[in-house]
């Protein structure tokens, strides 16, 4: 994928960039792998806003992606690389020997016509899914399970990957994109290679309207609100926060305060935190 820029015919176009979608080989999705996606406007069943700065956006159909990769000993052929509006990565349409179709995350280098497999005996090549115990040290992986059979949860966005560093009993030591090193059960599965479409992070959206198409609403600073709307609000002109620490709209400390539960069960699997030197 390459990044495409535009002539500055307007203020919104001046710095705008887009993907050239050169890797996309099919523009219409597989109907049997679509599901309805209803928008909530960031409101819950009571009608109350539960997430700020989210609402609207272009209508989308959800693509059913296979994150589990449990169809062992069956070879699948890559029929197409498709765009998925629900994620930053592209997806690959697979057709198995028995005619079953499925979507997977498209790893870097995967092309139409390539063969992919899953299972402990699969080759170590991009797109193949294996238990972590069957993957050599130093290999780049993505779509990593945290619980056996639950499906991949880690390293799924565009350009993401993790690396196997070693083994510790029934666990595999994995370094994630963030720099965090953690233990993952050896029976969990992962897919070989990096997630494709790595240049996605280089896109300049150019204008507010493109973010609205993505379902993002304006993010208003608390310092420009009234004091009844935000702890940072009020004052004459450009006033400071006026408190020992920056606050959330609900009066809780923010901007540096740790939010992870100290008693979270999975903390024991983190060998080194992402911010550790």
From Swiss-Prot:
The keyword Ribonucleoprotein applies. GO terms for molecular function: rRNA binding; structural constituent of ribosome; transferase activity. GO terms for biological process: cytoplasmic translation. Keywords: Ribonucleoprotein, Ribosomal protein, RNA-binding, rRNA-binding. One of its GO terms (cellular component) is large ribosomal subunit. Residues 212-277 are annotated as: Disordered. The keyword RNA-binding applies. Gene3D superfamilies: 2.30.30.30, Nucleic acid-binding proteins (2.40.50.140), Ribosomal protein L2, domain 3 (4.10.950.10). Residues 254-277 have a biased composition (Basic residues). InterPro entries: NA-bd_OB-fold, Rib_uL2_dom2, Ribosomal_uL2, Ribosomal_uL2_bac/org-type, Ribosomal_uL2_C, Ribosomal_uL2_CS, Ribosomal_uL2_dom3, Ribosomal_uL2_RNA-bd_dom. NCBIfam families: rplB_bact (TIGR01171). Part of the 50S ribosomal subunit. Forms a bridge to the 30S subunit in the 70S ribosome. Belongs to the universal ribosomal protein uL2 family. One of the primary rRNA binding proteins. Required for association of the 30S and 50S subunits to form the 70S ribosome, for tRNA binding and peptide bond formation. It has been suggested to have peptidyltransferase activity; this is somewhat controversial. Makes several contacts with the 16S rRNA in the 70S ribosome. PANTHER family: LARGE RIBOSOMAL SUBUNIT PROTEIN UL2M (PTHR13691:SF5), RIBOSOMAL PROTEIN L2 (PTHR13691). This is Large ribosomal subunit protein uL2. It comes from Leuconostoc mesenteroides subsp. mesenteroides (strain ATCC 8293 / DSM 20343 / BCRC 11652 / CCM 1803 / JCM 6124 / NCDO 523 / NBRC 100496 / NCIMB 8023 / NCTC 12954 / NRRL B-1118 / 37Y).
């Amino acid at each position: 994928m390459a990044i495409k820029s535009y002539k500055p015919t307007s203020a919104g176009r001046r710095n705008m960039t887009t993907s050239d979608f050169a890797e996309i080989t099919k523009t219409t999705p597989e109907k049997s792998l679509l599901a309805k996606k209803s928008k909530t406007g960031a409101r819950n069943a009571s009608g109350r806003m539960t997430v700020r700065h989210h609402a609207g956006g272009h209508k989308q159909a959800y693509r059913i992606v296979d994150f589990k990769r449990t169809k062992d000993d069956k070879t699948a052929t890559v029929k197409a690389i498709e765009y998925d509006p629900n994620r930053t990565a592209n997806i690959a349409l697979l057709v198995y020997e028995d005619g079953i179709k499925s979507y997977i995350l498209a790893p870097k280098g995967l092309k139409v016509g390539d063969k992919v497999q899953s299972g402990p005996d699969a080759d170590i090549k991009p797109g193949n899914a294996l238990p972590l115990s069957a993957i050599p040290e130093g290999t780049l992986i993505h779509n990593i399970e945290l619980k056996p059979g639950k499906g991949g949860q880690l390293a799924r966005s565009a350009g993401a990957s993790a690396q196997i560093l070693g083994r510790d009993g029934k666990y595999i030591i994995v370094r994630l994109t963030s720099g965090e090193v953690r233990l993952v059960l050896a029976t969990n599965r992962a897919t070989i290679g990096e997630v494709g479409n790595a240049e996605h992070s280089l896109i300049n959206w150019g204008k507010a309207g493109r973010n609205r198409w993505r379902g993002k609403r304006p993010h208003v600073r608390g310092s420009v609100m009234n004091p009844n709307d935000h702890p940072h609000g009020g004052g004459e002109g450009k006033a400071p926060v006026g408190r020992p620490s920056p606050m959330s709209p609900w009066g809780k400390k923010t901007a540096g305060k740790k939010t992870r539960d100290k008693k979270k069960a999975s903390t024991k699997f983190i060998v080194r935190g992402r911010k550790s030197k």
